[in-house]
């Protein structure tokens, strides 16, 4: 089985020589198997590993026992580990989300923090074929498009999934044969929550009455559809670049494209400005209609504005240029400026907003001379987890922020930009597990 995982890693180029891979280690069987397999491949494939464990604040004493187990396991293998705690039930209530939704976002935030702590460049998670089948089936019943039916990718950004080639049964057999101890989460066997119901009730029913090889069939379908999706996205990227102009995209060029390619062009444009996460099918439809609208027409979608400007369609945050000014930042309410409103509210530690026009930061790290002002020559910005600072102008260029969107009010201390709409917060004020005064900063345009 280790050989299969090794071949899967090589086939999908998940790990390269010299990589440092952070393993998301819950202590459950899947993550323990992942740790054991990757540990055995370290020398052969020339990479190193470390681990991270997050106590979700859900299962009381059992969760503390899991954390102790992970600590002891990492000590046994001589692996450095990073631990953390989060009150996910409270976070879910604050956001109006389910435990699943809140937990997933915070879990990946935590893993990114641990990755930065260790200087790792990959994060390995223990999703397997049964998880893949669940995801595909869940997207299917929710009416997903082709992208959702592809399931989870072996690699997306710095997240890798080396066990997607194995079934749950194969992992359990491996744990038994290798005599590996692991923790059992009793809540996984309670048919509450969408995924648990799917895992415990729906999939067994479909396997029993329709297709005993349901998991394998769904995973094979996902792989085939992924090839189609990849090809369509390549075409869309080429067409989007061909339509790219200064400040936007050629409306006429986009309007000539077939609907499957056009919708992917729009998703790619939204992704460039960090506004794809909450974009739904209805938003894509509205943007397609906007292509034929009069100049100056504008619509708002979560995290962005889209508007027409003569022959162009523009994606970003629609603003008007303002003169130079500065004013103090209110840390417990709203601050009105010429360019828009800054709103500061308490937030949960480890919270992460869904666009680059808001950020959760450590208010205790704000310098005494912090203020809101227009950008100035000589300003510098140090993006979170970046190796160093750079000129603000270069940061805007790297983020592909159109010129007309670079004069939003920013927050600064001297020449150091602490928060810039479209870029997010600076390294110097980022949250960590020890932060005591977490606040959310939002910029709301006029």
Model-predicted segments: where are they?
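Internal, active-site/partner-interface "lid" segment
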Residues: 188-189, 193, 216-226
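AMP-forming adenylation/ATP pyrophosphatase catalytic core
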Residues: 2-30, 48-50, 54, 86, ...
């Amino acid at each position: 089985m280790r050989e299969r995982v090794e071949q899967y890693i090589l086939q999908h180029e998940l790990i390269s020589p010299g990589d440092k891979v952070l393993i998301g280690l819950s202590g459950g069987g899947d993550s323990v198997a992942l740790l054991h397999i990757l540990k055995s491949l370290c020398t052969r494939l020339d990479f190193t590993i470390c681990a991270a464990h997050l106590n979700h604040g859900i299962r009381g004493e059992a969760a503390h026992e899991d954390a102790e187990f992970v600590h002891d396991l990492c000590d046994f293998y001589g692996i450095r580990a990073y631990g953390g705690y989060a009150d996910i039930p409270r976070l879910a209530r604050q956001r109006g989300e389910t435990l699943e939704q809140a937990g997933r976002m915070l879990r990946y935030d935590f893993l990114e923090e641990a990755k930065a702590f260790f200087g790792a460049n990959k994060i390995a998670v223990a999703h397997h074929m049964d998880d893949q089948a669940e995801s595909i089936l869940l997207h299917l019943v929710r009416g997903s498009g082709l992208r959702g039916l592809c399931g989870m990718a072996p690699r997306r950004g710095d997240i890798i999934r080396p066990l997607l080639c194995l079934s749950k049964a194969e992992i359990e057999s491996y744990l038994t044969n290798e005599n590996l101890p692991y923790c059992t989460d009793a809540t996984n066997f309670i048919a509450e929550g969408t995924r648990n119901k799917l895992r415990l009730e729906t999939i067994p029913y479909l396997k029993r009455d329709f297709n005993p090889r349901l998991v394998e069939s769904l995973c094979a379908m996902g792989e085939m559809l992924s090839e189609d999706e990849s090809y369509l996205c390549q075409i869309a990227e080429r067409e989007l670049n061909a339509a790219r102009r200064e400040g936007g995209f050629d409306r006429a060029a986009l309007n000539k494209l077939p609907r499957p390619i056009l919708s992917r062009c729009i998703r790619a444009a939204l992704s460039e400005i960090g506004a794809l996460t909450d974009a739904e099918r209805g938003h894509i439809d509205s943007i397609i209609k906007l292509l034929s609208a009069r100049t100056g027409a504008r619509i708002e979608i979560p995290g962005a504005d889209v508007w027409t400007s003569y022959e162009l369609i523009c994606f970003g945050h629609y603003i008007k240029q303002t003169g130079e000014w500065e004013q103090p930042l209110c840390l417990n309410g709203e601050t009105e400026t010429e360019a828009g409103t800054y709103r500061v509210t308490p937030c949960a530690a480890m919270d992460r907003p869904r666009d680059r026009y808001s950020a959760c930061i450590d208010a205790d790290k704000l310098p005494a001379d912090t203020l809101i002002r227009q950008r100035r020559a000589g300003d510098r910005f140090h993006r979170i987890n970046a190796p160093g600072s750079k000129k603000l102008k270069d940061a805007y260029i790297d983020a592909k922020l159109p010129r007309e969107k670079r004069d939003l009010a920013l927050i600064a201390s001297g020449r150091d930009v602490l928060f810039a709409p479209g870029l997010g917060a600076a390294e110097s004020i980022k949250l960590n597990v020890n932060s005591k005064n977490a606040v959310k900063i939002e910029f709301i345009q006029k």
